[in-house]
Amino acid sequence: MERPFGCFFILLLISYTVVATFDDEPSFPENADLTKDLEQKCFSINKVDPNLKFENDRLKRAYIALQAWKKAIYSDPFKTTANWVGSDVCSYNGVYCAPALDDDSLTVVAGVDLNHADIAGHLPPELGLMTDLALFHINSNRFCGIIPKSLSKLALMYEFDVSNNRFVGQFPEVSLSWPSLKFLDLRYNEFEGSLPSEIFDKDLDAIFLNNNRFESVIPGTIGKSKASVVTFANNKFSGCIPKSIGNMKNLNEIVFTGNNLTGCFPNEIGLLNNVTVFDASKNGFVGSLPSTLSGLASVEQLDLSHNKLTGFVVDKFCKLPNLDSFKFSYNFFNGEAESCVPGRNNGKQFDDTNNCLQNRPSQKPAKQCLPVVSRPVDCSKDKCSGGSNGGSSPSPNPPRTSEPKPSKPEPVMPKPSDSSKPETPKTPEQPSPKPQPPKHESPKPEEPENKHELPKQKESPKPQPSKPEDSPKPEQPKPEESPKPEQPQIPEPTKPVSPPNEAQGPTPDDPYDASPVKNRRSPPPPKVEDTRVPPPQPPMPSPSPPSPIYSPPPPVHSPPPPVYSSPPPPHVYSPPPPVASPPPPSPPPPVHSPPPPPVFSPPPPVFSPPPPSPVYSPPPPSHSPPPPVYSPPPPTFSPPPTHNTNQPPMGAPTPTQAPTPSSETTQVPTPSSESDQSQILSPVQAPTPVQSSTPSSEPTQVPTPSSSESYQAPNLSPVQAPTPVQAPTTSSETSQVPTPSSESNQSPSQAPTPILEPVHAPTPNSKPVQSPTPSSEPVSSPEQSEEVEAPEPTPVNPSSVPSSSPSTDTSIPPPENNDDDDDGDFVLPPHIGFQYASPPPPMFQGY
């Protein structure tokens, strides 16, 4: 047996060696440039049979290139390359020879045409050896990979067509090195990246780029192009149509369809008097049609459909001398000349469907048209049409103040004492329902006088739309006056807040949404933030309560948030604030206060500011006293009690949170948290005002932070303190709010856990907090105190709580407990039974 096996093994080795010898392929790097060294290597690797005779050396080089290419072909169903054998390369299928341009006595390979051969393979670097190649057509095959750099040697290239294949990578810049190139067709591949501006500096007659993955703006050098046909269709080009387009005197056809282009049409389009096809459909163009459009004297096909164009389609556009087809459907035109009505134009094809035209069939519903038609884009101020403002980018959405991702904002745990200024991170009160409530002043309940020196809210800081950026760092407000949450009021996301749901998005009705091209709601953008508000719905639990929650607490909390900053979860909560959004009825309160105390704590103080802005201001005062408690936030929860006492100032707002439960409540919002993210902006929703306080996101950080962090870190105590803050202004409101909070606490059975001992800390300050008027009652607002107790369920939920972040209650609940807190240890009796579902479940009539 051994001998037969040994013989078999030897035979196997011999056969393998023979196959390898015949199958030896050039070892050229795939994308190598064809330097002289590599050329020499190519000749040595691709040894030519000495028996083959060639008319000249150029045909020999072509033979080497074509044989290397044949080896790079994996599938040839039509046997197109089957006869690529022997030295007569001019007889190969798809290969064309002609006299050399520099020496007509020499025959060279001048062209390759393998169109529609369904060949699969790639392009080897050896193709660079065919230096006399002027025509290269391989469209409608299955070639893949990249266009090798070695093709830069093809200096005579005149037509390069690789369309309808599977090429990838960046724009093939080798094409920029061909001085004689006139026809460039890259259609239907997978090229990506930006379009080099140099492409329009070349003397090209046709540029086909459609159906790839290019994503960039259209270079302004397009005006230098002498091309007669240019197609950008079905890519991801964005921005404006360059105004230099008016300089393209040779242009006959230009196609922009299926991109993300925006803004108004530049007036220079009217200078294209030789254009026969102008297609700008399926983009995001806005505004009215420029009057210069009547300058398209040669246009035969004009397609502006599926955009967001408005205004009146005038008679002169529909009576262009050579016009055969004019499509302006799926826009927001609200008027058209009689000559533009389909069927009344002597056989011309007009399409006006899905607009806002009266007495015409198949139009958009009125509620979808109204938002767009009532606020048309002023193209005189649009950068795309020459204005200075830049309307092209559809009005920038109100800065999203990055929903102040509270969590990350690492609240700069402001040293409780110092931070007196609750420079709540300027959380954009995006949702801040009606952040305007600069009324914060109300929050600035002087009550903060609470000995804890509720963080001076610097008189409810006028919600300055503080830049959300800061939101993270809530510089702890000085306990003085209920934290004057300088909420960065993102104010006027406020709108969205009040009707969180409505706020969400542009309103389904928003024409933009309706219009196929939803991409760019140029005008509506601002609403975008609103959109977030809607998400709060989850938090909706007990929407009414939210309003109370919103009360000032948020500001106060801002300081505590720092403590929480550590726990990212709070950020999550930020969304909960949206929950508060439900309260829209009393939008103001919900917005501000809720966000801060609950979840937001993590966001750190940032949110707190927003709370103030909300109308809640009054409630805040009552809570503000609690702030003292909050001050503790910086300290770890374990110390909270003590800290609270010391840091009360910061905590002032904390009092509200003191009911840590609220923080837990926030957890309840957890559901809201899910929606939170979307909702963050709209704290309005019941879910704890936390989010509502536009700063919602920020509030989230602030209010809850303490609690949430408490879970994460002992710092809970600070959290509690924040609760008081909420009481800030109107103790009465606060008390109301508390009720919600308590309810919320109940619903969020989780609450129990949240509060951790730290909550107690608020107690010391609780009175101050409560008293927005000194009287702690407001602060405690019996219900809230209950809430606090529920939180007692200590840390267990903590982790979860942070996620809930909503804890709308937090802000408000503190009041009652605050009274208890005054004792210093009001370990919230764990209402384990209750789920802190959207904290603000407590629903006050009218909210």
Swiss-Prot record:
UniProt keyword list: Cell wall, Cell wall biogenesis/degradation, Glycoprotein, Hydroxylation, Leucine-rich repeat, Repeat, Secreted, Signal
GO CC terms of this entry: extracellular region
Biased composition (Polar residues): 667-682, 688-720, 726-752
Ranges for the LRR repeats: 45-71, 106-130, 131-153, 155-178, 179-202, 204-224, 226-248, 249-273, 296-319, 321-343
Chain intervals with Basic and acidic residues compositional bias: 438-484
One of the record's GO molecular function terms: structural constituent of cell wall
Subcellular location: Secreted, Cell wall
Pfam families in the record: LRR_1, LRRNT_2
Signal peptide: 1-20
Region (Contains the Ser-Pro(4) repeats): 522-847
Tissue: Expressed in flowers, stamen, pollen, and pollinated carpels (at protein level).
Disordered as annotated region, ranges: 381-847
UniProt feature, compositional bias: Pro residues: 485-499, 533-642, 838-847
Low complexity composition bias: residue spans: 768-783, 797-811
Annotated glycosylation sites: N260, N274
Post-translational modification: Hydroxylated on proline residues in the S-P-P-P-P repeat. O-glycosylated on hydroxyprolines.
Biological process, per Gene Ontology: cell wall organization; pollen tube growth
Primary role: Modulates cell morphogenesis by regulating cell wall formation and assembly, and/or growth polarization.
Protein name according to UniProt: Pollen-specific leucine-rich repeat extensin-like protein 2
The organism of origin for this protein: Arabidopsis thaliana
Lineage of the species this protein comes from: Eukaryota, Viridiplantae, Streptophyta, Embryophyta, Tracheophyta
Gene: PEX2
